[in-house]
Amino acid sequence: MDKRYKIKQAIVHITYTCEHHCPMCYANAGIRKEEPSLEYLCKVIDRLLELDIKDITLVGGDPAIYTHIVELVVHAKKNGAMLSILSNTLEFNGKREDVLDFIDVYEGTIHHSDPGKHDSFCKVEGAYDKLINNLKFFSDRGKSVGVALNMIPYNYNVLADSVESIIEKGIKIDHIIMQRIIQFGRATGMNNFEISSEMLGEVLRQVESLENKYGIKVIFEDPLPFCAIDKKYYKYMHPCEWGISKISVDYKGNLSRCGADVFHSFGSVFDDVDYLWTTDDNIKAFREKKYLPVKCHECSLFFKCGGGCPISRNPEHGFTADYLSKSGKII
């Protein structure tokens, strides 16, 4: 396999069940509600480890409410996985103590600095307080804690406040994960979760402030095109890693280039993954980036930028230029 395309991290959707009802959730309500067996999920994890993919992040739905979450993380860790988990609750069915030695990184999604507005967004009363309590539990015990922030019109101007309010509660935040919402799942056909260039500028100012003030690591999960941002923010960006070094796996072992891109599924973790990873037509099309404008390919920063998110407009319609792209015009 070409070393440029070695899979280094797997994001595993172990369940699509969640007690929250966020309006833009990718795990769309009403579908895929069955709960996978522990035995089968262990086989999926074992296969990833066999492929030398040890960096594994458990997601959902809400992976922390999966019935057998304790047994699963114990199995994964004992067999060599480096485990992270991204959850709306970090509840672990009341068994937080039981997972302490087996999960390396604990991440929670915060929707707003105002607890009431967070709860209103996910339609669960007390959701904010529950998550904060659990983040503090793991932080107090020296575990790595991160916060995922969705950049949307609902909260773009209070993202720094959202993080600082957590820090003020005595929680040490190691990193923040910045994400955009695309037209997928419950958000299909809706653009009201997309941010404007002006909103993006405000987000980046807040991100830089948090980094400078607290030394927090900033991770942009779906990077932005360089032509959409000021040069001083290039340091946060990178070409999209999904389809390069990151892969998405569902609880049945099905593979897709990206967790928000199930329209580009390409086989099973139990197949010859190395072969699929280098020969699948959709993955090759993503890497070649012929879907981007000529101006992007001619840009001197093209290989550092990568064009942003290839499915930011609508994954069902295939790869396109990022909706924030100015087609190679550098700010």
Where are these regions (language model features)?
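Hydrophobic pocket-lining residues within nucleotide cofactor-binding pockets
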Residues: 63, 90-92, 151, 181, ...
